[in-house]
Amino acid sequence: MKLSLDWMNDFTPLKEVGLDVILKKIAVSVCEIDGVVPFRPELDFVKIVRIESLDKHPSADKLQIAEVFDGSSKSQIVTGATNVKVGDLVPLAIPGAKLGDREILESELRGVKSSGMFCSEKELSLSEESSGVWILNGIEGAEIGKTIRSFLYYEDIIFEIDNKSITHRPDLWSHFGFARELASQLRLPITFNPFESLWNFDLSMKLPRVLENQNAHSYYASSICEVFVIPSKRKFQSRLQKCGIRVINNVVDVSNYVMLEMGQPTHFFDKRFLESQGGVSLEVSYAKKGESFALLDETSPSLEEEILLIRNQGRPVAVAGVMGGKESAVQNNTTEIVMESAVFAREKIRKSIRSTGIRSDSSVRYEKGLEATTTLPVIRRALNLLKENGCPSLKASEPVGFLHTPHKEVRIHTDIHFINTKLGITLSQGDITDILERLHFMVSWKGDRLEALVPKFRHNYDVTIPEDLVEEIGRTRGYDTIQVTPLLAEIKTPIRNLSRELERKCKTFFSVGLGYHEVYNYSFQALKENELDGDVELSVKIRNEMPEEQSVLRNSLISSLLKNIRTNQDRFSEIKIFEFGRAYFNIPEPDNEKKFFSFAVSFDRKSSESDLGLLEDDFLKVRKEIESFLKYIRIFEYFWDIKPEIFFHPGASLSLIVDSKQIGNLGYVHPAVLDSFELKKRVIYGSLEFEKLVEIWNTNRNISRFNVPSQFPEAEIDISILIGEKENTNLFTDLVRREKIPELQEGWVYSQFAGGSVPVGKRSVSYRFRLVNYEKTFTQERIKEISDHLVALAGKNGFVLR
């Protein structure tokens, strides 16, 4: 938005204050400024001169030599203009002037010195076309020696305001509103208030008809006669041009002028056109779907039912608050008009803008939310401006219309302690009263309690709560005057989130230590995928309509991880992934939602792989990884139990048991499941219930398991036995552990073999047991004694030695 300093000076003496002071106060207390520029400063080098004489050029038939007078001296100009004569007042660009890309220099034309150039309106960028030098004879204000910039009222400073910084301040979208704000901030008086304009309405004139409804906050119309449509006076033209508004004629220009001055849009209808429709009967109503009529911008959009229209005798003549109709617009021969001044709900104007795609200067102001009581004062001001701008004898009927909330008030209650606490400084009641009254609030105190009546131009959406008052006081006093002090806050040890802490440990160990990659999946999946793990009847269905493959919440993570492997099986030979995720069940809380830590591994073994040795090695490798993870999170007492699962191969399905509770599982995914997911390779899948894992870890995390290393050499005993093809290898290690051999530190399976000389249905399993003595070196006799004990234990329990 562009604001003219000269225009704002009509309302308060801003020119008496230094420009630097104004700019600093705007930046600190009002809004952001994109730029401050003088308007058309190049026209200071173009003066009005009078042609004293004209002579033919001695060496060029189409050139003339003119002697001109600028009020203090004479100079010689060579010109090719044919429309000038002695005595004419014309604009002269003197040497040093820059007009567009052209710089005027003192030069010689065919041997004759020329000290400048006569200018046309086009050369001065005042018109798109011109027929010759601009002749200024008889034009008001055209005086010899005056600069064109002064003649055109262009001697001005333009403030370019950042619109987004005043979106919440509709009162600042006008010259008077901004001047009023600056007057408050700089302690300047208001010398003229356009909202206090007076006008004597002609009570004998026929009144227009306005149908009252709830489609506008306020709507008034007045009939105006003895109107003459002519070009606007220079003052009006220049002020509109400085704000980037196109000049049209004196009537339309006044409508734009009053909008820029007071922030309230108005509209003029050609009364003769309205009467041709059967009389003047205006109404605010909604469009009919598909309705269309020509607008001022030559478009005819198809309208939606949510768009507000102005109708006359039921026919559309304007899109309310956005743009007028072409047929009802003021014409060059218009002598009577109907003036409209209205305020519409901002949300309705926003819908019209969105639907039509039209964003006008009027709609920009309406969408911010205007104060409804301004409609009548704006009519009075516009009538005064029309009279000043070429319609000296106009008459106007008394405005007719409605105002729904004439006595709306917003009162805010707070106390001095609240204000000072929020600002972080100590202000007295006098300080607060001074600031608020300068901002046009009405203030009253009862002890430390404050009541502030918000001015009408601020109470719609801007200032409504005590915090808004604090902001007004703070910005007016100046945020730069508030001393920066460090915040005082109690330092507390943060509460440990054990679940989050263990989750980070798990992710770090699996990704950094074991080379797994973390994956993220949606919780939506197909109902048939929930059949893999659990009761499908407990599936949680998604209420809003979804595709069949995303119709329920998952009850385990196996389907998600298998789909991840399917996506990547042709890209990588080995896939190791894990996911932290939730599973959902249609049962009462808190068991309706569980968090799982699940993982899946594919070692590039085809689903038809029949080499049991390779498959068992892969499985033992993954199991060893999980056991190292359990040790990492301080879970030392556990065992693996054979437990069939429908999604696991019956020969490779284990449950992890800790403290007699199952906390997870591990196994080869069943070939039928692999086929259903179109998987070409064997997959090992495992899952741990995370809440149970957290509980066990929390119990064990402070227990020290450190053992002082023995100073004596360790010993190892290997033993190989035959066990059933489907028997758990833990059976023998559990038997050994229960014997409580003092020197026995640990035991594990280090190899397995099936086929060859091994009987059918059996497999050869080799165990290794580590022996540690803290008191003396092992003797061969003691090692043999323990070895014989293990052999006897195996035979006693039906195991055959290899």
UniProtKB/Swiss-Prot annotation:
Binds 2 magnesium ions per tetramer. It is found in: Cytoplasm. It comes from the Bacteria. Pfam families: B3_4 (PF03483), B5 (PF03484), FDX-ACB (PF03147), tRNA_bind (PF01588), tRNA_synthFbeta (PF17759). Its cofactor is Mg(2+). The keyword ATP-binding applies. One of its GO terms (molecular function) is ATP binding. Its EC number is 6.1.1.20. GO terms for biological process: phenylalanyl-tRNA aminoacylation. Residues 40-149 form the tRNA-binding domain. GO terms for cellular component: phenylalanine-tRNA ligase complex. Belongs to the phenylalanyl-tRNA synthetase beta subunit family. Type 1 subfamily. This is Phenylalanine--tRNA ligase beta subunit. It comes from Leptospira borgpetersenii serovar Hardjo-bovis (strain L550).
